[in-house]
Amino acid sequence: MPEVLSSCQNLLFEEASSIQLKVMDPSPWIDQEIHDGQSIGEDHLPFRSLKVWQELSEVLDCRMGVPKPEGGHLLLSLHPLPGELWRARNSDDSDVYDPLGHYGHIHKMEDPHWLRDYFLCLKQCSLGPNSKILSLGVNRGDELFVLKNWYPSTYDKFSFTGFDLSQKAIQSCHKAFPESKHRFEVRDISDDPPEELPQQDLLISLSTLQCSNIEGKEVFRRWFQKSLSPSASVILGFPNCSWLGGEVVYGARMRNQPHPDPSRLMKDLMYYRKYLQTHGKRVSITGKHHLFLVGSAI
């Protein structure tokens, strides 16, 4: 693999429009326990799964086309992704999160890891009938809408409250959740929670507390102390990815750095974990492209 990666990088440096690879078809060994790089067959060639080639494509910031069979092998084509890395969370402009704009093209619920990990977090929260659920930075309410799939018998009894700076995001929420028991408002979450807000049973904030235009830790402490019931749970989401040409790219990348740097992400995770543990919550962390931290009652 080292020589393959080096050759592909050289081709991209020379601004190749695509990379063509002829590789072994791994299909005959699909039911066997074989590790990538393990010698197989009479020629003792290194085994490489399609997942490895997909990972190579991601490392190169490319999109892999559908493999085409050719004489017992596969032809792979890798195409450089267009555009620039998208990091809306670093912008101070609320319109960047317009659900009808670029941000609206991103559907995290199409990521199986996101769905699986979010569901694992919800299972730790023990949501009962008539639960009150608060979302800070709600956008179009994806994290609320998906609850219908996992709580079919109690979903209609949940009441949702969501705040966001984007007027268009709040309009989307009103369309998705028209019932009068739900509350969605344009609000700066840096402000204190509304005094009339009932105590909530679950606070959700996904990819919001890391925005550069708010003091995320201070905001969280305020809402945690003033808006939640003593037995409430918390689910926080932290982006561990960016987007390039419509593809999710693994790893949190800082500006002016060509590679992922998880240092800020790890620092934030450790802060929120310690804070919630100090306040008597059981805390766990999971995730891939998005890391979830869940704090639930012990």
Give the residues covered by each predicted segment.
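Conserved beta-strand signature within the Rossmann-like core of class I S-adenosyl-L-methionine
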Residues: 231-240
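Class I SAM-dependent methyltransferase Rossmann-like catalytic core
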Residues: 68-127
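Conserved glycine-rich SAM-binding loop
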Residues: 139
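A short, conserved alpha-helix within the catalytic core of class I
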Residues: 211-223
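N-terminal accessory interaction module
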Residues: 1-90
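A short acidic, Gly/Pro-enriched loop at the edge of an enzyme's catalytic core
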Residues: 194-203
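Conserved Class I S-adenosyl-L-methionine
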Residues: 247-273
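Class I SAM-dependent methyltransferase SAM/SAH-binding core
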Residues: 134, 142-191
